[in-house]
From Swiss-Prot:
Pfam families: Profilin. Binds to actin monomers and regulates the organization of the actin cytoskeleton. At high concentrations, profilin prevents the polymerization of actin, whereas it enhances it at low concentrations. At low concentrations, associates with the poly-proline motif of formins to enhance actin filament elongation rate. Acts redundantly with PRF5 to regulate apical actin polymerization at the tip of pollen tube and control polarized pollen tube growth. Functions probably by favoring formin-mediated actin polymerization at pollen tube tips. Keywords: Actin-binding, Cytoplasm, Cytoskeleton. GO terms for molecular function: actin binding. Specifically expressed in mature and germinating pollen grains, and growing pollen tubes (at protein level). Belongs to the profilin family. Occurs in many kinds of cells as a complex with monomeric actin in a 1:1 ratio. The gene is PRF4. SMART domains: PROF. Disruption phenotype: In germinating pollen grain, the double mutant prf4 and prf5 reduces the amount of F-actin and induces disorganization of actin filaments within the apical and subapical regions of the pollen tube. It is found in: Cytoplasm, Cytoskeleton; Cytoplasm. PROSITE patterns: PROFILIN (PS00414). This is Profilin-4.
Length: 134
């Protein structure tokens, strides 16, 4: 299965609410910042944004004072799982990032998708990739 198939079928899928809702954007990005696969509207990283995200996995709390930035958009960092999951909130939407052995799985959502639905979709794929040694 290609990385793009993982994004298209496992991240941009129906979130399971029975109403056909799905994430706004998603991607799988290597630890070096290279994009393995992404949805058509996934925002592009600017400057130090990706390295700051990776630093927060190594030093949990790094992003809390300044916020998490994606393509210049600021997300308030909310409770995640230190070293494993970063979650952010921006208005009626947010972001979930799950770190795996070789990559980071990104999911961005807007209402009516809920934070819990985004977390479930992103973390389910992230956990699967971890089980596969990826």
């Amino acid at each position: 299965m290609s990385w793009q198939t993982y994004v298209d079928e496992h991240l941009m899928c129906d979130v399971g609410d029975g109403q056909g809702h799905h994430l706004t954007a998603a991607a799988i990005v290597g630890h070096d910042g290279s994009v393995w696969a992404q949805s058509a509207n996934f925002p592009q990283f600017k400057g130090q944004e990706f390295s700051d995200i990776m630093k927060d996995f190594d030093e949990p709390g790094h992003l809390a004072p300044t916020g998490l930035f994606m393509a210049g958009a600021k997300y308030m960092v909310i409770q995640g799982e230190p070293g494993a999951v970063i979650r952010g909130k921006k208005g009626a939407g947010g972001i979930t990032i799950k770190k795996t052995g070789q990559s980071c799985v990104f999911g961005i959502y807007e209402e009516p998708v809920t934070p819990g639905q985004c977390n479930m979709v992103v973390e389910r794929l992230g956990d699967y990739l971890l089980e596969q040694g990826l």
